[in-house]
Amino acid sequence: MRKYAYLKNPQKCNDKEYIYKIMLHTHKEGVYLYEYCSLDAIICSYDQLYFDVSDIYEDWNSEIDERGWIDIDDPLPEN
């Protein structure tokens, strides 16, 4: 499963960069959260590994905009 979301307000991640959108990706190792420092970025700037998707929702649901989580297809089958 993959879902992405845009943040209501950019989140500062260091002295120069802000996170504008995020994507979650469930994997056999856990759930990856990819963080993008540009609205049109296709390659993430940062990532985090969570044990459960509910932890991502708990951390991020209040930060995403009114469009909510948007489902997208997995580009490749998981090995």
What kind of feature is each model-predicted range?
Residues 1-16, 75:
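Negatively charged, low-complexity tracts enriched in Asp/Glu with abundant Ser/Thr
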Residues 16-19, 28, 50, 61:
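Low-complexity, intrinsically disordered short peptide segments enriched in small/polar/basic residues
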Residues 39-79:
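Mixed-charge, Lys/Arg-enriched low-complexity segments
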Residues 19-44:
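Short aromatic-glycine-(Arg/Gly/Cys) micro-motifs in beta-strand/loop hairpins
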Residues 12-24, 56:
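Short, low-complexity, intrinsically disordered N-terminal segments
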